[in-house]
């Protein structure tokens, strides 16, 4: 099949990322031991160039389906590519000094770009086997990122647990895809939708459940969440921050495309399943987060709960609420990316234990203010980014007309209240407790981490200024 120039143009963000991935990897080999700073700069340039390519295509109104309908470049995909490349860029900035000190900048930066590349491919896939390959491209480097810090035993343990559960999840996903392919006779989402025009057979339902289960592993949805705290605690802080947002955004985008493009007739089945998973995930994440004194593990369980909030929007994808449900997923993904990336990276500047934040306002007031913004946003306090994500989910759920979705929305409200003690506990420690030492916090970070934290705090606080354009973009995403 000949590849048109238009297809190459649509693939520009991925091609740019691939080119820089090779340059970064080979740069570490040929430039010698003093290439760490150069490699980090090239990685930052590559992720920024991919972001610019995606932004240019979006601004130009580019849209098309290529490779036999198996790959779509539309506003929906480009929106998520912007999230993925932006988080990759800021992760490179935050990780640069650490990677230079360890002498592993080429390898670490290559992994960041590889995860971003897999995510970009994933959000455009309209072929189920392509989805599987893109998921693997995004997750295999993730295993290495979690286990990357060879000096810490927890890193190896977290990486091993992540690898084992990831392999199980991939098996579920692939088996589900094979069942769907066997029943429908195609892996292309358009043809799958045609084959299931009159509803899903029992075998197809099993395949659907297995696919959703496999992807639920990847986004830390309960009961498939158990790898998350150990992986995030063991990973380098920049890796935990990046993996908590970028791959998850890509998985949510892929799941939206699979369900709405490939199985719209089965919406009553998968929306009910999503509602149940969402409710369980919210409660599991928040109840376990309440028990944590380690802030990194607390944020890991918090990420489980937020996956539940986003899955509640999936449950609302029925009736007149489909459009608002898609908007909710898209807006929440952007909102969560900025506030969670910043919250995780703040740990690098302060410390992992809750007591490390004691008296932070007295010693580093700007950093304390930034962390307070992140914690309040994760609760959903207006007008911060998290509020708009949750508000859109509630709005979509209210318009769904489903009693089960109403329960999921009520669970979201209850769990938001349930999360207040552990988020605001950090704020209380920073503003009311005595500093951990006379000299200030126990740990200081570098300029790249601080820059990223303050940038994310600013984006979190000013998110309301971009909600209108984001909502308009989501409404015209081209998915529906």
From Swiss-Prot:
Signal peptide, first to last residue: none
Membrane topology of this protein: Multi-pass membrane protein
Record-linked InterPro entries: NADH-Q_OxRdtase_suN/2 (IPR010096), ND/Mrp_TM (IPR001750)
Keyword presence, Transferase: no
Pfam families in UniProt: Proton_antipo_M
EC numbers, comma separated: 7.1.1.-
GO molecular function: NADH dehydrogenase (ubiquinone) activity; NADH:ubiquinone reductase (non-electrogenic) activity; quinone binding
Reaction catalysed by this enzyme: a quinone + NADH + 5 H(+)(in) = a quinol + NAD(+) + 4 H(+)(out)
Transmembrane segments annotated in the record for this chain: 11-31, 38-58, 76-96, 105-125, 128-148, 163-183, 195-215, 240-260, 270-290, 298-318, 329-349, 368-388, 407-427, 453-473
Annotated keywords: Cell membrane, Membrane, NAD, Quinone, Translocase, Transmembrane, Transmembrane helix, Transport
Subcellular location: Cell membrane
Cellular component, GO, one term: plasma membrane
GO biological process, one term: ATP synthesis coupled electron transport
Keyword Translocase (UniProt): yes
Function: NDH-1 shuttles electrons from NADH, via FMN and iron-sulfur (Fe-S) centers, to quinones in the respiratory chain. The immediate electron acceptor for the enzyme in this species is believed to be a menaquinone. Couples the redox reaction to proton translocation (for every two electrons transferred, four hydrogen ions are translocated across the cytoplasmic membrane), and thus conserves the redox energy in a proton gradient.
Family: Belongs to the complex I subunit 2 family.
Self-association state and partner proteins as the record states: NDH-1 is composed of 14 different subunits. Subunits NuoA, H, J, K, L, M, N constitute the membrane sector of the complex.
Annotated protein name in UniProt: NADH-quinone oxidoreductase subunit N
Organism of this sequence: Rubrobacter xylanophilus (strain DSM 9941 / JCM 11954 / NBRC 16129 / PRD-1)
Lineage: Bacteria, Bacillati, Actinomycetota, Rubrobacteria, Rubrobacterales
Gene it is expressed from: nuoN
């Amino acid at each position: 099949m000949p590849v048109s120039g238009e297809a190459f143009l649509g693939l520009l963000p991925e091609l740019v990322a691939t080119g820089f991935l090779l340059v970064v990897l080979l740069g570490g080999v040929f430039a010698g031991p003093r290439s760490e700073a150069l490699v980090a700069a090239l990685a930052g340039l590559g992720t920024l160039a991919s972001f610019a390519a995606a932004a240019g295509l979006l601004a130009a109104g580019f849209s098309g389906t290529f490779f036999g309908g198996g790959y779509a470049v539309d506003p929906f995909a480009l929106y998520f590519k912007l999230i993925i490349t932006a988080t990759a860029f800021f992760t490179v900035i935050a990780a640069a000094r650490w990677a230079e000190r360890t002498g592993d900048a080429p390898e670490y930066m290559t992994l960041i770009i590889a995860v971003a590349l897999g995510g970009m491919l994933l959000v455009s896939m309209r072929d189920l086997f392509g989805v599987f390959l893109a998921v693997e491209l995004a997750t295999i480097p993730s295993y290495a990122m979690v286990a990357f810090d060879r000096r810490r035993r927890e890193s190896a343990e977290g990486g091993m647990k992540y690898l084992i559960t990831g392999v199980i999840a991939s098996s579920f996903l692939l088996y589900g895809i094979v069942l769907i392919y066997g029943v429908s006779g195609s892996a292309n989402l358009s043809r799958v939708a045609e084959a299931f025009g009159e509803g899903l057979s029992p075998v197809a339902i099993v395949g659907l459940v297995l696919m959703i289960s496999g992807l639920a592993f990847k986004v830390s949805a309960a009961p498939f969440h158990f790898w998350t705290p150990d992986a995030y605690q063991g990973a380098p802080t920049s890796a935990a921050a990046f993996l908590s947002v970028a791959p998850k955004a890509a998985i949510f985008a892929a799941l939206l495309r699979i369900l709405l493009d490939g199985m719209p007739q089965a919406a009553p089945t998968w929306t009910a399943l999503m509602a149940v998973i969402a409710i369980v995930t919210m409660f599991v994440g928040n109840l376990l987060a309440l028990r944590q004194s380690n802030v990194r593990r607390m944020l890991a369980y918090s990420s489980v709960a937020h996956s539940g909030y986003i899955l509640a929007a999936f449950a609302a994808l029925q009736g007149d609420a489909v459009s608002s449900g898609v908007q909710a997923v898209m807006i929440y993904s952007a909102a969560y990316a900025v506030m969670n990336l910043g919250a995780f990276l703040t740990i690098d500047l302060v410390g992992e234990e809750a007591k490390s934040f004691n008296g932070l306002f007295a010693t580093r007031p700007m950093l304390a203010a930034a962390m307070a913004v992140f914690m309040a946003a994760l609760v959903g306090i207006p007008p911060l980014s998290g509020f708009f994500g949750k508000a859109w989910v509630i709005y979509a759920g209210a318009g769904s007309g489903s009693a089960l979705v109403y329960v999921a929305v009520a669970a979201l409200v209850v769990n938001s209240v349930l999360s207040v003690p552990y988020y605001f506990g950090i704020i209380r420690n920073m503003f009311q407790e005595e500093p951990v030492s006379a000299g200030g916090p126990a740990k200081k970070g570098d300029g790249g981490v601080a820059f990223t934290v303050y940038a994310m705090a600013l984006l979190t606080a000013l998110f309301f200024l971009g909600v209108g354009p984001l909502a308009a973009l989501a409404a015209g995403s081209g998915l529906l």
